[in-house]
């Protein structure tokens, strides 16, 4: 675990469902952010003890990033489930366009329930599956958008982030990055 910016922590863990040959890396990132109102865990997996003890809530970027969230015993904020999900994550459902009570704004990513989150107090952008790094820096994941969703449409949805102060970008399928990486990813 390392502090990548004041009040922002990053760690990696092996995803338990990963199998050789999958198009994403076995090691995935999780984050903790001190929002000023509490410590939020984003897409948590193998949370370090010192952060688990301070955490006040879990925020998921997408419902399939449940990881360790249900076992932490914390309030969970989750995008709507994929129908028909036989075992949806139980929690407070939020959508693109919503602002959570602790200053996290949600932007729709490549699907209505894959959200890109802006943590106002830390000028941080948290990204689930919409932006990934496959060795060329952050980019819109061109293979995962839903049917009929073009990468250009996803970029258009996320461009308002460039009007906000962004100091750090926190992708779950890459290492933390800076504003310049976000600008490059959204410059189709």
Where are these regions (language model features)?
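Short Pro/Gly-enriched beta-strand edge/turn motifs at strand-loop
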Residues: 8-20, 97-104
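Pre-active-site segment of Zn-dependent metallo-hydrolases
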Residues: 10, 16-57
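Metallo-beta-lactamase
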Residues: 2, 6, 13-16, 38-41, ...
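Active-site HxH/HxHxD metal-binding segment of metal-dependent hydrolases
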Residues: 21, 45-100
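A generic local structural motif
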Residues: 26-29, 44-50, 64-69, 112-114, ...
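Short glycine/proline-enriched coil/turn segments at helix->beta-strand junctions
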Residues: 36-37, 52-56, 72-75, 102, ...
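A contiguous pocket-lining binding segment that forms or flanks enzyme active sites
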Residues: 89-120
